[in-house]
Curated annotation (Swiss-Prot):
Keywords: Cytoplasm, Methylation, Protein biosynthesis. It is found in: Cytoplasm. Belongs to the prokaryotic/mitochondrial release factor family. It comes from Coxiella burnetii (strain RSA 493 / Nine Mile phase I). Peptide chain release factor 1 directs the termination of translation in response to the peptide chain termination codons UAG and UAA. Pfam families: PCRF, RF-1. This is Peptide chain release factor 1.
């Protein structure tokens, strides 16, 4: 392992010990916010420190085995050789574990998200596909124990959605769904197609982490136009005769958000503002990402496949994720919400890239 990584691990071990002392300090205990913050940091450092302690113990055992190899007794030397072989394998395993533990965590991974699906090219068939995608994510959320609340929806003429925005609430939602942003393409014979021809349609999916108060972008109320209207469409069980639904337009950017899920205008406004915050923050992050991507592109050339991240081919029962050249003939299972076979490889690919960067430092 590189000396720079060893130094980093020693620094983290010192910090872990320091926090351990602070957590028993009465001043810290009485400050609930600080105590909670330090407790969280302590819990994050613990697996790294425990693994590093095992690594250090293993290093000492390797030193002892190497010393034993110098013994005159051939039996002792043979024992030392066998032990050294096992310890070297263990060292490699521990190094891999430590590198994985040192990979920077995405600060948004534990957040709830706003899921936005928009029908793209393909007219009515695209809207039907948007409905299929929404059901796929809703079923996936159900298997994970997450909750899905529709914030706003505009239904298609023949079913599905022209646009649907939902809030997905649960543990580690963003960590799993963050790979879903992009264009999703479907190839199938539409119900309305009499000639049996395969049509291609597309939808765009956006996954936006919900914003904490700390991260919020300052919004000038004078730059907002707020309209009220009667709730309709999805969430119709809450429809009433008052204009409880809210539409907010952020005038400088033209971003428009709606919420018609809650019974009261006040709650709808609060939810719409939360969605607006997430959209504006996502736009700001996207701008930063584009700037970074432009710099990278100038160095390594274009490899961007974000225009079309995944294809769902119904005649062949095939799902292809174009970012990692993954092809699965499990379309029925995937569209029914079994997304782990798709998301798992994407997570592993990201970890492999991060590990390669870490090893190259």
């Amino acid at each position: 392992m590189k000396p720079s990584l060893i130094e980093k691990l020693k620094t983290l071990t010192y910090r872990y010990s320091e926090i351990g002392g602070l957590l028993s300090d009465s001043t810290v205990i009485n400050d609930q916010d600080r105590y909670r913050e330090l407790g969280k940091e302590y819990a994050q450092l613990e697996p790294i420190v425990k693994c590093f302690q095992q690594f250090q113990q293993n290093e000492k055992a390797i030193e002892s085995a190497e010393e034993m190899q110098q013994e005159k007794d051939p039996e002792l030397r043979k024992l030392a050789e066998e032990e050294l072989e096992q310890l070297t394998l263990k060292k490699e395993e521990l190094e891999d574990q430590l590198k994985l533990l040192l990979v920077p965590k995405d600060p948004n991974d534990e957040r709830n998200v706003f899921l936005e699906i928009r029908a793209g090219t393909g007219g009515n068939e695209a809207a039907i596909f948007a409905g299929d995608l929404f059901r796929m994510y809703a079923r996936y959320a159900e298997t994970k124990g997450w909750r899905v609340n529709i914030v706003s929806a505009h239904e298609g003429e023949h079913g599905g959605f022209k646009e649907v925005i939902a809030r997905v609430i649960g543990e580690g939602v963003y960590s799993q769904l963050k790979f879903e942003s992009g264009a999703h393409r479907v190839q199938r014979v539409p119900v309305t197609e009499s000639q049996g021809r395969i049509h291609t349609s597309a939808c765009t999916v956006a996954i936006m982490p919900e914003v904490d108060e700390i991260d919020q972008i300052k919004i000038n109320p004078a730059e907002l136009r707020i309209d009220t209207f009667r709730a309709s469409g999805a969430g119709g069980q809450h429809v009433n005769r008052t204009d409880s639904a809210i539409r907010i337009t952020h005038l400088p950017t033209g971003v428009v958000v709606e919420c018609q899920d809650e019974r009261s205008q006040h709650k709808n406004k609060a939810r719409a503002m939360s969605l607006l915050q997430s959209k504006l923050l996502a736009a700001e992050r996207a701008k930063q990402d584009q700037e970074q991507a432009a710099k990278r592109k100038s160095l390594v050339g274009s490899g961007d496949r974000s225009e079309r991240i995944r294809t769902y081919n119904f005649p062949q029962g095939r799902v292809t994720d174009h970012r990692i050249n993954l092809t699965l003939y499990q379309l029925d299972e995937v569209i029914e919400g079994d997304l782990d076979p798709v998301i798992g490889p994407l997570i592993r690919e990201l970890q492999a890239e991060q590990l390669a960067e870490l090893s190259g430092e």
